[in-house]
A protein has these predicted regions:
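A shared catalytic/ligand-binding motif for oxyanion handling
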Residues: 1-123
Length: 123
């Protein structure tokens, strides 16, 4: 099963996100929501409870007006996701790679992404 944000062909490469669910587990999907052309939420039943997958395509750093909308949307979703769910945040957050790591965060993320993670409980 493929869930796609469905952006028009003439803007392809600027923003779009997709999540692919193998057919053997597609019957486990509780629901999915296309929040916008950069964020898809998919909730699935697992043996240990529910898993919410947030597939994202972040804004390139330096585009502050779009960055604000992107992170506001992500924060809104995280506020309403069931607090007992496991959360998997996947995708391309388009951060510029640096050499400085951030405590409790895997990888050398872009500045906006690192700041966001420091301000939220996602680690």
């Amino acid at each position: 099963m493929v869930i796609h944000s469905g952006v028009d062909r003439h803007i392809r490469g600027q923003s779009a996100v997709m999540i692919w669910i193998h057919k053997s587990i597609s019957n486990k999907i509780d629901h999915y929501k296309l929040w916008n052309n950069r964020v898809i939420e998919t909730r699935m039943k697992t043996q240990r409870g529910h898993l919410t997958i947030l597939a994202v395509y972040g804004v390139t750093e330096g585009r502050e007006e779009l960055n604000g909308v992107f992170y506001d949307t992500l924060e809104k979703i995280l506020d309403i996701v069931n607090k007992n769910d496991y959360i998997m945040l996947i995708g391309d957050r388009n951060g510029r790679i640096g050499n400085n790591g951030v405590a409790n965060i895997v990888g050398t993320n872009g500045e906006a992404t690192a700041i966001y993670y420091r301000l939220t409980t996602i680690r």
